[in-house]
Amino acid sequence: MAARTKNGLTASASGMQSLLPHTLPHADPAGPRDSLYPAFFTGIDEAGRGCLAGPVVAAAVILPPAGAPAAPHIAAALSGLTDSKKLSEKRRLTLEPAIKSCAVRWGVGVVWPQVIDRINILQATYRAMSLAVRHLRGGGAAASMPAGLPPVFLAVDGDKTIPGQVLQAVTGLSVPQEAIVGGDGCVMAISAASVLAKTFRDRLMTALDKRYSGYGFATHKGYGTAAHIEAIRRLGPCRMHRLSFAKVKPAAAPHAADQNTLW
């Protein structure tokens, strides 16, 4: 059974708390803080939480520890890695294969609009993050991690950790966690996760643009731009729109009679 610690972390009764460092970092724009976490910790971030259309996508990344023999190579290969929002699309696409090659494990979780509307975006984000952990697979540096070792610690971007009951239900794991505000800019594994989540989701939205033409998904990726909202007013919502979102409802209202036949 999980227990709350004085740091506000969720730790299992099996002694996982012993893996935690004595002092956990807060957001620090000076640079990555990965060395303050247990070896083989998992960095987690999401993309698309605030969008009006498309799924919310999360990624999880485990990088080799700072003292690993491959560390100098990783530092060079991932030079300039930071919050995906601060990187150009070209740079993100260059970093994506490098991250997968340098990672011990990486995974992606996707939750679609119908589920978002049913359980709300926050719960959907928790589920996407949990799915990313469940889908962790071997990366290019898989051999550096002991075989069969489960995730030992989750560093989650933002101000909230994944509720223990959600993580347990999706992954079967009870793992200590910490939420780090601005973690995508100061923890390399979270930065890597932010890039994988963003590139994966952008690719999905570009593909969806071909199926649901007229909305401009390939351009705005589902965010609430003026052009996107105008397209919803003109065409009505499609199956990729989040009907529970406040900005979608007014634009979709004139098409309410067509809601049962979303294309």
UniProtKB/Swiss-Prot annotation:
Transmembrane intervals: none
Catalyses which reaction(s): Endonucleolytic cleavage to 5'-phosphomonoester
Listed cofactors: Mn(2+); Mg(2+)
Occurrences of domain RNase H type-2 (ranges): 39-257
Localization annotation: Cytoplasm
Gene Ontology process terms (BP): DNA replication, removal of RNA primer; mismatch repair
One GO MF term: RNA binding
Entries under Pfam families matching the protein: RNase_HII
Positions contributing to a divalent metal cation binding: D45, E46, D157
Cofactor note: Manganese or magnesium. Binds 1 divalent metal ion per monomer in the absence of substrate. May bind a second metal ion after substrate binding.
UniProt keyword list: Cytoplasm, Endonuclease, Hydrolase, Manganese, Metal-binding, Nuclease
Domain of life: Bacteria
GO (cellular component) term, any one: cytoplasm
Enzyme Commission number(s) of this protein: 3.1.26.4
Primary localization: cytoplasm
UniProt-listed InterPro entries: RNase_HII (IPR022898), RNase_HII/HIII (IPR001352), RNase_HII/HIII_dom (IPR024567), RNaseH-like_sf (IPR012337), RNaseH_sf (IPR036397)
Family: Belongs to the RNase HII family.
Functional description taken from the UniProt entry: Endonuclease that specifically degrades the RNA of RNA-DNA hybrids.
Family matches, as NCBIfam families: PRK00015.1-3 (NF000595)
Protein's name in the database: Ribonuclease HII
Organism: Oleidesulfovibrio alaskensis (strain ATCC BAA-1058 / DSM 17464 / G20) (Desulfovibrio alaskensis)
UniProt lineage: Bacteria, Pseudomonadati, Thermodesulfobacteriota, Desulfovibrionia, Desulfovibrionales
Annotated gene: rnhB
